[in-house]
């Protein structure tokens, strides 16, 4: 089984985590922000896949090791490229920046393990070639000594970290997949299935209705996800288990007051989790109305 995971921020303090396969939404989970505890709560309700594609959301790798330890992770190569682009910009002004930008961009066209090996070699050689340039230092406004080309170093490290974690080219290795599974001609290297499908449509809906309250935005997320599940109930049946604006508002207020809570909707399989101090203590449970 191949799965995709992603998170959508409904507001600055509310995020909905979504997990889907090639056709349907399999689960979603509402949290204040992406963290390993929230990811675990979502993943525990879903059968472990052979491979999961992620954009690198905070806490996901930690949750993956705990809940789906045998699943292979494919880091979305497009997001890996975008992370480099944020540091270099789309028009780098230095030779080192231009070269690193092109190396990152070439991630999007790698089709086999040979090309992947050549790409890794290019990344290593880039660091060697520009070693002197990258080692230049400067002092900031406080007089602290720091790398002059710190943004380039961060960009390179973001790629090198993914290489060490062995999560960039999982899509090129079919040895761990069940022969009965069918994903077409190629395994996915990006999260486009969920980013360009489920999430893109949901983001568009939320963007077109910016004036909606947080309670309504949460309900929109729930409705949208639910209607993309394999066998959704009728609208009248959904209304019987749909959380009300009042119940969402009450719970969201408790979150903002830094209450430690974890609620759930058994019928929907969704919940809200608020966990800031990263302790293992149990917390009180608040159910929806």
Regions found by a protein language model. Give the residues of each.
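RNase H-like nuclease fold core
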Residues: 1-70
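Short hydrophobic/aromatic residue motifs in ordered secondary structure
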Residues: 9, 58, 82, 198-199
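Short, function-defining helix-loop hinge/capping sites that tune catalysis or transport
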Residues: 14, 63, 87, 203-204
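Conserved beta-strand -> loop -> alpha-helix junction used to position metal-binding or nucleic-acid-contacting
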Residues: 55-104
